[in-house]
């Protein structure tokens, strides 16, 4: 992704999506090239894919920018560099699959006679990108897919969205039936993920909470830490899937408290794969994944 190299954790769920997608396609004997920022690493299950890395100026996450902000269209932008590299490889390929939420790869669909397929990773976070999705989708409706209906609803001009959910390599997760560990929260530590609500709940019921994920906003994390006694929050950092599932599987429950329209909610499925029940806000993808009272519990959004 343009905000961080693969294996850094900065790309959030997109990194897991890419790993699962590439691994699945390789198992079906497809030839795969992956273009990513320099220092990227692929997971072991994707090792037979060809990895091409490029350098360029990174950008901030769209959810942390003003809705009316303009795209960085400089020649040195990492998005443009990745797109340029991908286009140089097309003579041996059938299609480009774009996982970035950015203007250039989407607009390029109108400019070249080669299929560029877009798996949109976020809801409507940018007017400029929403407008280009609308324009390109009207010409190439089958070139776009979304993770959930809740996410696709952010784009009302798309009347019949293609919903693909997400894929998971379940062999990477160990199902643990009995556990009496602490509560868990997993995700990028940033305001839109709503960690403060999960910590509040844990504190109110006298429980400790393990927090896994890259700290994207240091001030936000520090403010949450300041509000609660030392030891109530156990910061675990970002871990690869094999290490995450070991610790997550020992927890009693995962609390999922997104403040935005979560496109899917990979961590919800990851917790389920470990045998950990999930309590989540009924918002975005988690509201579709969880069957209330059967595979987890849903509560009114923001009702901590």
Regions found by a protein language model. Name each.
Residues 1-304:
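Catalytic cores of nucleotide-sugar-dependent glycosyltransferases that transfer UDP/GDP/TDP-activated
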């Amino acid at each position: 992704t343009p905000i961080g190299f693969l294996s850094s954790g900065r790309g959030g769920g997109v990194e897991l999506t890419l790993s699962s997608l590439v691994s699945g396609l390789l198992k079906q004997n497809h030839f795969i090239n992956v273009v990513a920022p320099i220092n990227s690493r692929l997971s072991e299950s994707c090792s037979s894919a060809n990895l091409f890395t490029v350098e360029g100026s990174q950008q901030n996450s769209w959810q942390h920018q003003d809705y009316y902000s303009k795209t960085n269209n400089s020649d040195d932008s990492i998005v443009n560099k990745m797109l340029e590299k991908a286009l140089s490889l097309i003579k041996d390929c059938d299609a480009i699959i774009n996982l970035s939420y950015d203007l250039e790869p989407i607009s390029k669909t109108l400019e070249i006679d080669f299929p560029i397929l877009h798996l949109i990773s976020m809801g409507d976070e940018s007017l400029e990108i929403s407008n280009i999705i609308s324009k390109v989708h009207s010409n190439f409706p089958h070139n776009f897919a979304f993770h959930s209906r809740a996410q696709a609803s952010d784009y009302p001009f798309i009347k019949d969205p293609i919903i693909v959910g997400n894929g998971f390599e379940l062999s990477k997760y160990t199902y643990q039936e009995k556990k009496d560990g602490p509560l868990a929260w997993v995700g990028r530590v940033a305001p839109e993920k709503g960690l403060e609500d999960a910590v509040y709940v844990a504190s109110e019921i006298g429980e400790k909470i393990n927090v896994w994920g890259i700290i994207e906003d240091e001030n936000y994390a520090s403010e949450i830490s300041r509000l609660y006694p030392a030891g109530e929050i156990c910061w675990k950092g970002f871990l690869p899937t094999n290490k995450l599932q070991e610790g997550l599987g020992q927890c009693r429950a995962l609390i999922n408290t997104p403040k935005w329209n979560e496109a899917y909610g990979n961590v919800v499925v990851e917790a389920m794969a470990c045998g950990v029940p999930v309590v989540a806000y009924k918002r975005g993808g988690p509201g579709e994944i969880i069957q209330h009272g059967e595979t987890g519990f849903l509560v009114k959004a923001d009702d901590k």
